[in-house]
């Protein structure tokens, strides 16, 4: 809800979220975007996220949600993005479809195709998925957008001869909007003239897109989301920051606590904070975050700063970087060991570089 309020205040009325892919292969680079491996939990979170983003679509603080990536994108062979998926109907229906059905039940406005193929047919050109299940059995009334260039990607899959062929396959299958491949823009009109694509399919796609614009109220006021004063008021609102902190605190899972070392005693005299992430602001933003050189860092608190603000006056903090965010240089190990030997407690902050996961 807060993300929608702030996004809408900045003039945004459509977000490409939630990502509701079930992820069971840790090698896949987009695991961190979703809710994990369980279809029940994934469905509950998917439903809640759609409700949070959209609220009542006509409201000024609502944004259209987009359920992605339909479907089985997270089951690509070997965890290789854009790869093939070989899956039984039972696995599809019991595990991978439920979170998407939950978004339909929540009234999600849009769907996005997956880059993968499913049993030999790319998701973007898969009539069984888009027309038979999504728009047929589930009676989805919104529209389907391709993923970035995924209509053209059907050529790379070896399923379409060229973009002209890909456009025909995609619109026939039920993909309503072409994002970035220009296959519709360059080919759809001619395909209709040649009677290779019924005009009724184009009409249906256009109707679905316009319907959602009406639902947002954009035809009544195309600038309803453009309000600089509201943007100043809503962005980094203290109540929003407080809620974000509360959500983060409630979401942390403690996997191990040997000798009951946590919570740290306020009487701890010396704490060593070691690792390349300790003073790196970017580390707190995770993957798919904008390059921090381009944003205001006023509200970014490093792990070091956070701990520094929290410990008592009688606690001494020591720091050693130890190693770089990525690479194999061990020159900093000696300093890290020395700092550790001077301390009562060591906090080690290491992890994957921000740009090592994703597509």
Regions found by a protein language model. Name each.
Residues 1-359:
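Glycoside hydrolase catalytic-domain context in secreted enzymes
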């Amino acid at each position: 809800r807060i993300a929608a309020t702030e996004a809408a205040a900045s003039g945004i009325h459509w977000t490409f979220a939630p990502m509701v892919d079930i992820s069971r292969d840790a090698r896949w680079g987009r695991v961190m975007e979703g809710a994990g491996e369980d279809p029940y939990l994934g469905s509950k979170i998917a439903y809640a996220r759609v409700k949070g983003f959209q609220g009542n679509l006509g409201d000024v603080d609502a944004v259209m949600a987009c359920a992605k990536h339909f479907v089985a994108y997270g089951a690509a062979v070997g965890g290789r993005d854009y790869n093939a998926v070989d899956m039984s109907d039972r696995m599809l229906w019991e595990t991978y479809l439920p979170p998407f059905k939950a978004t339909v039940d929540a009234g999600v406005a849009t769907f996005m195709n997956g880059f993968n193929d499913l049993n030999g047919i790319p998701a973007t050109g898969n009539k069984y998925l888009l027309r038979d299940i999504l728009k047929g059995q589930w009676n989805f009334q919104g529209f389907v957008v391709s993923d970035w260039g995924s209509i053209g990607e059907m050529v790379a899959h070896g399923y379409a001869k060229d973009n002209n062929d890909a456009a025909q396959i995609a619109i026939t299958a039920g993909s309503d909007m072409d994002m970035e491949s220009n296959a519709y823009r360059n080919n759809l009109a001619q395909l209709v003239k040649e009677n290779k694509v019924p005009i009724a399919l184009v009409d249906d796609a256009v109707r679905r897109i316009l319907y959602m614009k009406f639902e947002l109220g954009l035809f009544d006021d195309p600038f309803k989301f453009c309000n600089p004063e509201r943007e100043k008021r809503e962005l980094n609102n203290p109540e929003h920051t407080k809620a974000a902190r509360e959500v983060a605190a409630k979401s942390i899972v403690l996997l191990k606590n040997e000798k009951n070392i946590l919570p740290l005693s306020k009487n701890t005299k010396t704490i060593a904070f070691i690792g390349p992430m300790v003073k790196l602001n970017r580390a707190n933003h995770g993957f798919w975050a904008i390059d921090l050189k381009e944003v205001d860092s006023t509200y970014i608190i490093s792990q070091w700063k956070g701990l520094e603000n929290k410990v008592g006056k009688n606690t001494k903090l020591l720091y050693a970087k130890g190693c770089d965010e990525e690479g194999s240089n061990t020159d900093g190990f000696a300093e890290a060991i020395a700092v550790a030997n001077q301390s009562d407690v060591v906090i080690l902050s290491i992890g994957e570089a921000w740009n090592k996961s994703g597509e």
